Structures are given as structure tokens and as C-alpha cells.
């Protein structure tokens, strides 16, 4: 068949524009496309929620791609292996309780699982601010193109209305810190004091699930952002806690959606 370059342009512009407009109102906006939010997005979408992931970078997956120090392998504890099974991620036992998976396969299948379930992904779209209403409750997000943010260009953003936001932005806990910076007297965990603690894998893995909660009205925190927001230790290239945190975030969000 003959190809018309203009039709190609129109197809891309038309279809993406329709999707963007359709997702100006969502049930849950997940900020950051790391493993916790990918897990949360899948389970939310499977439950019928309208969800979108906003990732500033070109690719999703957070720090999982590189495994440990660019060795593309990750470790997962036994209690999280059921989530690997759910996504069809292969793994093998290294020692009792320690399971190893290929980091690249893991990210690919997490992304596939989330999108196949119906989660929409907006990569190269950065979070800039939250929308608030009565009592300063979070009711939406403010977004811009990722390159605009990186280059610090003076371009006004656009807004997305959402019932809930999940901060899965990793060590920086970007959404949490934005609220602390811009809403007077806002209280979010221990942010503004110490932030994330140094490495302690065992404790960090335990606390990341405990720290996954609605940390501010309309905002759930998950993954490494949860540890940062609650002054909990980092854990390195062991990802069971990340996966379980995403699962818990989805359950919490579904419970909250029923209340709204």
C-alpha cells in the first residue's frame, strides 16, 4: 500500500488528542511510572477504575531496569512472588526466601500488565502541582511536558481532575514535597525534617508497605516515596516491598473511591 505522511501525522495527533481529552477527568492519577505504581495501576484498572500514569521520563520502570549497579537482576522475597506470578514474571530461588528475576523482563511485564488491564500511560508528561478545593483537599494535578520541565521553559501547564492521587515518584516524593511547600501547615509524615533514612534492607522492606497510606486528604503515597515521606530506610535492589506497596495502594484507593 502507499503511505501518506500527512495521514500518519493526523492519525497520531488525532488519536492522542482524543485520549488526552478523555483523561482530563480520572478516578486515580498515578504520578511516576515505577514498579509500585505499575502494580497499583493494573489492580485498579482491573477493578474498573479509570486510571492514568504520568511519567516525566521517556520510559517507565523507575530504577528497576538497571537492577543492582547495572547488573540486570533484582531480588524479591517469597511473600511477593505471587505478584510476580500474577504478571507472568519468571524467577528462580537463589537461597531460601531469596528469589532472583531479570530486571528487564520484570519491567516489561509490569508495563504490559498495567496497560493490558486498561491503565493509560502518559509518558514525557511531568507533574507540576496539585489542584485543591475545600479544606485544601487534593482534587487534581497540574501537568506539563517533561522536556518543558527539564529545560525550565516558561510554559503554562494544563490541569487534570482526579478523585485520588498516588505519589509513586520514588526517593524525591515529589507530590508530597509540593504539598508541604505550597500548602500552609500541611503535615505529611516526617518530610521537611529528615526524609529517607540510609540503607537497611530488612527494615526498609517492612516499612514500605506499612508506610503506604493516605498521607494527606486525596493523596496516597506508595513505593520509595512512602519511605521518604515517613523517614524510613532505603532498601536497594530488592523489590518485594515495592510490589506489595503497589498492591496495597490499589486496595486503599478502591476503598477510598467507594467513599467519595
From Swiss-Prot:
Major enzyme class: transferase
UniProt-listed Pfam families: Thi4
Residues reported to bind Fe cation: 156, 171
EC number: 2.4.2.59
SUPFAM superfamilies associated with the record: FAD/NAD(P)-binding domain
Record flagged with keyword Iron: yes
Intrachain S-S bonds: none
Binding site for glycine: 234
Coiled coil: none
One GO BP annotation of this record: thiamine biosynthetic process
Pathway: Cofactor biosynthesis; thiamine diphosphate biosynthesis
Binding locations of NAD(+): 36, 55-56, 63, 154-156, 224
Annotated GO MF terms: iron ion binding; pentosyltransferase activity
Annotated keywords: Iron, Metal-binding, NAD, Thiamine biosynthesis, Transferase
Superkingdom: Archaea
Catalytic activity, as annotated: hydrogen sulfide + glycine + NAD(+) = ADP-5-ethyl-4-methylthiazole-2-carboxylate + nicotinamide + 3 H2O + H(+)
Cofactor: Fe(2+)
Subunit organization: Homooctamer; tetramer of dimers.
Protein's job: Involved in the biosynthesis of the thiazole moiety of thiamine. Catalyzes the conversion of NAD and glycine to adenosine diphosphate 5-(2-hydroxyethyl)-4-methylthiazole-2-carboxylate (ADT), an adenylated thiazole intermediate, using free sulfide as a source of sulfur.
HAMAP family per UniProt: Thi4
Annotated family: Belongs to the THI4 family.
Protein name from the UniProt record: Thiamine thiazole synthase
Organism, as annotated: Methanosarcina barkeri (strain Fusaro / DSM 804)
Amino acid at each position: 500500500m502507499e503511505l501518506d505522511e500527512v495521514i500518519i501525522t493526523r492519525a497520531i495527533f488525532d488519536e492522542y488528542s482524543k485520549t488526552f481529552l478523555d483523561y482530563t477527568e480520572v478516578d486515580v492519577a498515578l504520578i511516576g511510572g515505577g514498579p509500585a505504581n505499575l502494580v497499583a495501576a493494573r489492580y485498579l484498572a482491573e477493578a474498573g477504575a479509570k486510571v492514568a500514569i504520568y511519567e516525566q521520563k521517556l520510559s517507565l520502570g523507575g530504577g528497576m531496569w538497571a537492577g543492582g549497579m547495572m547488573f540486570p537482576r533484582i531480588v524479591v522475597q517469597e511473600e511477593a512472588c505471587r505478584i510476580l506470578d500474577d504478571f507472568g514474571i519468571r524467577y528462580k530461588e537463589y537461597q531460601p526466601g531469596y528469589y532472583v528475576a531479570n530486571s528487564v523482563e520484570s519491567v516489561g511485564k509490569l508495563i504490559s500488565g498495567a496497560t493490558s488491564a486498561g491503565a493509560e500511560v502518559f509518558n514525557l508528561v511531568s507533574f507540576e502541582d496539585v489542584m485543591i478545593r475545600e479544606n485544601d483537599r487534593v482534587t487534581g494535578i497540574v501537568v506539563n511536558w517533561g522536556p518543558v520541565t527539564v529545560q525550565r521553559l516558561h510554559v503554562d501547564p494544563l490541569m487534570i481532575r482526579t478523585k485520588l492521587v498516588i505519589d509513586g515518584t520514588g526517593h524525591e516524593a515529589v507530590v508530597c514535597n509540593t504539598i508541604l511547600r505550597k500548602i500552609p501547615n500541611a503535615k505529611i509524615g516526617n518530610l521537611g525534617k529528615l526524609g529517607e533514612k540510609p540503607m537497611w534492607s530488612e527494615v526498609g522492606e517492612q516499612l514500605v508497605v506499612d508506610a503506604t497510606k493516605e498521607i494527606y486528604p486525596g493523596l496516597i503515597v506508595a513505593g520509595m516515596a512512602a519511605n521518604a515521606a515517613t523517614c524510613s530506610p532505603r532498601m536497594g535492589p530488592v523489590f518485594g516491598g515495592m510490589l506489595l506497596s503497589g498492591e496495597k495502594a490499589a486496595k486503599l484507593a478502591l476503598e477510598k473511591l467507594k467513599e467519595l
